[in-house]
From Swiss-Prot:
Origin species: Rubella virus (strain RA27/3 vaccine)
Keyword hit for Lipoprotein: yes
Record-annotated site: Cleavage: A300, G301, G582, E583
Name the record gives this protein: Structural polyprotein
Residues passing through the membrane, by range: 535-555, 1029-1049
Glycan attachment residues as annotated in the record: N353, N371, N410, N429, N658, N759, N791, T1011, T1012
One example GO MF annotation: RNA binding
Binding residues annotated for Ca(2+), in chain numbering: N670, A671, D718, T719
UniProt modified residues of type Phosphoserine: S46
InterPro entries registered for this protein in UniProt: Rubella_Capsid, Rubella_Capsid_sf, Rubella_E1, Rubella_E1_1, Rubella_E1_2, Rubella_E1_3, Rubella_E2
Highest taxon, organism lineage: Viruses
Region (Human C1QBP/SF2P32-binding) residue spans: 30-69
Keyword Phosphoprotein (UniProt): yes
Length: 1063
């Protein structure tokens, strides 16, 4: 197709003016050449338009271009002036008694003769189409002898996201120019279709309607009407446009569709002339599927119903006991259901949850309720074939004759033995009597150890019947009408037609003092209706109605704004499988980066980081205790930095001398060994007053009697040695402390779950992976933190303080409560106290300890040459009242901002596959270590094949799902070797090192309170559907009925959404 120039509204009007003038001239010329009187013709009563200008003998009947509500034919040009004058009546009209009201004059329209003239032949507009013609938009040009389109005005729609769910209705008339042309860039010009015959829309709507757009979002079909939907932007606002498209053009060819950007639509197909996308049926289909899921998953009371409580689940058949416990079988407790944790255990006078008292692996196997007496003291548990027995140690002798078993009326216990345990002995051949519950000699763990064990005497337990459980039986595929008693507790009093019910009894209805139980849907419905006034049933009814209300809201929202229909249809068409969890495991993970565990997929802690809002608290310079000194093998005459310049470094001495609160001390060692006792002794009077008279000094002078002068070696013993020490608090030029406040601190734990990285916090402790959902029990966030960044000659060290400081309390003098300067030049805190100097001998035991706060110890050191000695200085903590020193920071802070109190708890839920898994190769290098039928899990390890998760089975027992690679698990084994292992397909033999169950019948392990992982029973969708087929059938019927009602409502809203709130 050749490209053409886009046609504007001005070009369209000029073309219409030109064609109108040509048609007028042609009709006028034909009328003047052949003007003859026409024979009268009887008026057809069915026609209401003007019959002038029609040949009565013509084979065709003219049909006008009538729109909605039109009374005249506007499809052709008006008659010429000459013909108008002849057709008018020559009889003058009677004058009215009063002046008629002035009629509104039509606007002056442009003609083709360079001027403007009124259109008196039209008169005032009486309908929207006449109003469009009065505004200058000419009617379509048709041959009077050809049929015109029957539908003149159609309705299109516009709506904008910026204005909410407000629809603009645009009534327009198709300009009869045949096939709409295309622009040069291949886009369709919608301005050619804009010829309004209704109320004038707002200006911004007109601009949006005339905005060219080449992308088509969808095509809608309704009978012979076709709409194309487009979305585009006008001035930053996103608009949606629904355009009515002509079915066939005047040239006889189908009108071409606008170019589609996402798919190709074939218009010449015999079966599907139009492709409908994102229509209402898709939205209704989505609602239908959601309704089916909501009804199917709701337990609508179609199981065996009792008006008192929900029926319990089917119990596991009891396991067989060993032959050596056959005579105690009547005293053993009844077995319960796998994974059932609702039992209670009576210990003394208190009832406790069985999962808190019994060993951890009891939660994985069958168990019953035990009733212990008050005086029992033992906590041992004996195991045999997954059966556990509480055994006691007691010195109480048994009675001479055992008390017979009695049955109490209306009690939950069947038999209570009133016996006491026998005394325990050390011999293996001793026994405790026939009334014991299977307890025997306690063996050692190692099978090769032949040492004697000790006898653990058990107490016969109280047998308790399992709770009553029902099931429904079908007859020849009909609905379940009969009730089957699976387990019966005599105390419940269930009867069938007056006969007590026993396991295996089939009955339409059971009666007991607690109520009635039946499987009939009618009876179940009656029970539900009778109990509808209760809170539980009202809440259940509300929960069942919520999905329908949501579906209605979604459908209504979809019909009002089509943006949701596309998303909802995409979800339905692409498919969505809600996550269904098959297994649940719980384990712990340490908090050190790099820790890893198996739960059951590998989980590793990659790192821990903190996120917080940081506020700068400024910087300060801490006080620094600095000391210097010298060891001199004589008594100097000037004890100062200038007089001791040969022995003391000048720069540190001057910095310390000019510091704050300095301490300066001069010691003379062995002053009396140099002759002139009285003279030299007078030098060292208290306070050193005599020495200062002869020797200028600013330090305290003290004698050091008893100190060794061996530092100045190689001279007679009368050598005099002196020690000088100087210390003070100074501002160190290379020490600074910067303070930062951390608020809204949040700990982010970076985990790697089977190679998938995710971050968990206290706000979002979940991690969704392709293998399942991981829930992490993270410790609470540390809260507000204060960070001290200590810089010492370029080396930075951060210390963390927990919580905000109490500046009005004990932390008033802390660094965070002081005003700091950005350049770290301000000293913080009050002036410290004077340091204390002390002369310590080299062999003094005091040197084995550390100097006290504010103390400086000086020790003479023997030099490498004669008359050369050194000085060793040790400074203690700062030790003053102010707390802004680094010692305070170290004492009140920590290097790690947060130490979790314990490991992270990981709860992993594996995803249950909807489809059956593929057949995998058998696992390799599988080893089984441990024992079987002994109550202790055995270790199973090996390599799972690739291609998906391996559902490991050992001799037909499912041990769980494992990803490809190495796996290690523990399982209770019921069968002896050899062991056949598989992943659901081919099997292979595993190597086993197991202990004989006879040698490990009694492990003698002392248990406390344990928590362990609980594995739920896995069930496929097919199994679930087979077990609930009747519920699914009723749910589907209800869903179809309700979906039909919703479809009717949504359909009405969809087709009338613009008419409800037009603009």
């Amino acid at each position: 197709m050749a490209s053409t120039t886009p046609i504007t509204m001005e070009d369209l009007q000029k073309a219409l003016e030109t064609q109108s003038r040509a048609l007028r001239a042609e009709l006028a010329a034909g009328a003047s050449q052949s003007r003859r009187p026409r024979p009268p013709r009887q008026r057809d009563s069915s026609t209401t338009g003007d019959d002038s200008g029609r040949d009565s003998g013509g084979p065709r009947r003219r049909r006008g271009n009538r729109g909605r509500g039109q009374r005249r034919d506007w499809s052709r040009a008006p008659p010429p002036p000459e013909e108008r004058q002849e057709t008018r009546s020559q009889t003058p009209a009677p004058k009215p008694s009063r002046a008629p009201p002035q009629q509104p004059q039509p606007p002056r329209m442009q003609t083709g003769r360079g001027g403007s003239a009124p259109r008196p032949e039209l008169g005032p507009p009486t309908n929207p189409f006449q109003a469009a013609v009065a505004r200058g938009l000419r009617p379509p040009l048709h041959d009077p002898d050809t049929e015109a389109p029957t539908e003149a005005c159609v309705t299109s729609w516009l709506w904008s996201e910026g204005e909410g769910a407000v629809f603009y209705r645009v009534d327009l008339h198709f300009t009869n120019l045949g096939t709409p042309p295309l622009d040069e860039d291949g886009r369709w010009d919608p301005a050619l279709m804009y010829n309004p015959c209704g109320p004038e829309p707002p200006a911004h709507v007109v601009r949006a309607y005339n905005q060219p757009a080449g992308d088509v979002r969808g095509v809608w079909g309704k009978g012979e009407r076709t709409y194309a939907e487009q979305d585009f932007r006008v001035g930053g606002t996103r608009w949606h446009r629904l355009l009515r498209m002509p079915v066939r053009g005047l040239d006889g060819d189908s009108a071409p569709l606008p170019p589609h950007t996402t798919e190709r639509i074939e218009t010449r197909s015999a079966r599907h002339p139009w492709r409908i996308r994102f229509g209402a049926p898709q939205a209704f289909l989505a609602g239908l599927l959601l309704a089916a899921v909501a009804v199917g998953t709701a337990r609508a009371g179609l199981q065996p119903r009792a008006d008192m409580a929900a029926p319990p689940t089917l119990p596991q058949p009891p396991r067989a006991h060993g032959q050596h416990y056959g005579h105690h079988h009547h005293q053993l407790p009844f077995l319960g259901h796998d994974g059932h944790h609702g039992g209670t255990l009576r210990v003394g006078q208190h009832h406790r949850n069985a999962s808190d008292v019994l060993p951890g692996h009891w939660l994985q196997g069958g168990w019953g309720c035990y009733n212990l007496s008050d005086w029992h003291q033992g906590t041992h548990v004996c195991h045999t074939k997954h059966m556990d027995f509480w055994c006691v140690e007691h010195d109480r002798p048994p009675p001479a004759t055992p008390t017979p078993l009695t049955t109490a009326a209306n009690s939950t216990t069947a038999a209570t033995p009133a016996t006491a345990p026998a005394p325990c002995h050390a011999g293996l051949n001793d026994s405790c009597g026939g009334f014991l519950s299977g307890c025997g000699p306690m063996r050692l763990r190692h099978g090769a150890d032949t040492r004697c064990g000790r006898l653990i005497c058990g107490l016969s337990t109280t047998a308790q019947y399992p709770p009553t459980r029902f099931g429904c039986a079908m007859r020849w595929g009909l609905p379940p009408w009969e009730l089957v008693v699976l387990t019966a507790r005599p105390e419940d009093g269930w009867t069938c037609r007056g006969v007590p019910a026993h396991p295996g009894t089939r009955c339409p209805e059971l009666v007991s003092p607690m109520g009635r139980a039946t499987c009939s849907p009618a009876s179940a419905l009656w029970l539900a209706t009778a109990n509808a006034l209760s809170l539980d049933h009202a809440l259940a009814a509300f929960v069942l109605l919520v999905p329908w209300v949501l579906i209605f809201m979604v459908c209504r929202r979809t019909c009002r704004r089509r943006g949701a229909a596309a998303a909802l249809t995409a979800v339905v068409l692409q498919g969505y499988n809600p996550p269904a969890y098959g297994e649940e495991a719980f384990t712990y993970l340490c908090t050190a980066p790099g820790c890893a565990t198996q739960a059951p997929v590998p989980v590793r802690l990659a790192g821990v980081r903190f996120e917080s809002k940081i506020v700068d608290g400024g910087c300060f310079a801490p006080w620094d205790l600095e000391a210097t000194g010298a060891c001199i093998c004589e008594i100097p005459t000037d004890v100062s930095c200038e007089g001791l310049g040969a022995w003391v470094p000048t720069a540190p001495c001057a910095r310390i001398w000019n510091g704050t609160q300095r301490a300066c001390t001069f010691w003379a060692v062995n002053a009396y060994s140099s002759g002139g006792y009285a003279q030299l002794a007078s030098y060292f009077n208290p306070g050193g007053s005599y020495y200062k008279q002869y020797h200028p000094t600013a330090c305290e002078v003290e004698p050091a009697f008893g100190h060794s002068d061996a530092a100045c070696w190689g001279f007679p013993t009368d050598t005099v040695m002196s020690v000088f020490a100087l210390a003070s608090y100074v501002q160190h030029p290379h020490k600074t402390v910067r303070v930062k406040f951390h608020t809204e601190t949040r700990t982010v734990w970076q985990l790697s779950v089977a190679g998938v990285s995710c971050n968990v916090t206290t706000e979002h402790p979940f991690c969704n992976t392709p293998h399942g959902q991981l829930e992490v029990q993270v410790p609470p966030d540390p809260g507000d933190l204060v960070e001290y960044i200590m810089n010492h000659t370029g080396n930075q060290q951060s210390r963390w303080g927990l919580g905000s400081p109490n500046c009005h309390g004990p932390d008033w003098a802390s660094p965070v409560c002081q005003r700091h300067s950005p350049d770290c030049s301000r000293l913080v805190g009050a002036t410290p106290e004077r340091p204390r100097l002390r002369l310590v001998d080299a062999d003094d035991p005091l040197l084995r300890t550390a100097p006290g706060p504010g103390e400086v110890w000086v020790t003479p050191v023997i030099g490498s040459q004669a008359r050369k000695c050194g000085l060793h200085i040790r400074a203690g903590p700062y030790g003053h009242a102010t707390v802004e020193m680094p010692e305070w920071i170290h004492a009140h802070t920590t290097s790690d901002p947060w130490h979790p109190p314990g490991p992270l708890g990981l709860k992993f839920k594996t995803v249950r596959p909807v489809a059956l898994p593929r057949t995998l190769a058998p696992p390799r290098n599988v080893r089984v270590t441990g024992c079987y039928q002994c109550g202790t899990p055995a270790l199973v390890e090996g390599l799972a094949p690739g291609g998906g998760n391996c559902h490991l089975t050992v001799n037909g027992e499912d041990l769980g799902a494992f990803p490809p690679g190495k796996f290690v698990t523990a399982a209770l084994l019921n069968t002896p070797p050899p062991y056949q292992v598989s992943c659901g397909g081919e099997s292979d033999r595993a190597s086993a090192r197991v202990i004989d169950p006879a040698a490990q019948s009694f492990t003698g392990v002392v248990y406390g309170t344990h928590t362990t992982a609980v594995s739920e029973t896995r069930q496929t969708w097919a199994e679930w559907a087979a077990a609930h087929w009747w519920q699914l059938t009723l749910g589907a019927i209800c869903a179809l009925l309700l979906a039909g009602l919703l479809a009717c409502c949504a359909k009405c809203l969809y087709y009338l959404r613009g008419a409800i709130a037009p603009r």
